């Protein structure tokens, strides 16, 4: 409407990245999706398979929903931790 491109930042896990990727693909002004590549194991290891990419582009799957399947025992490998999950760096 205003000629501004949409460029969401997906700074958490790959499920959020896939959801944002679908949004960017559906938007007429969707330009790019930025993913945090240093998130840690939760970023990719929560899925049974990594989503396909080609030349740095996320390939949106054709299956229903987010076109992804959770890995086995995700809740066992990544249990809920009460409180914050940030690390404090002492200088």
Say what each PLM segment does.
Residues 1-65, 69:
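Shared catalytic-loop signature of beta/alpha-barrel
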Residues 65-91:
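Extended hydrophobic packing segments that form well-structured cores
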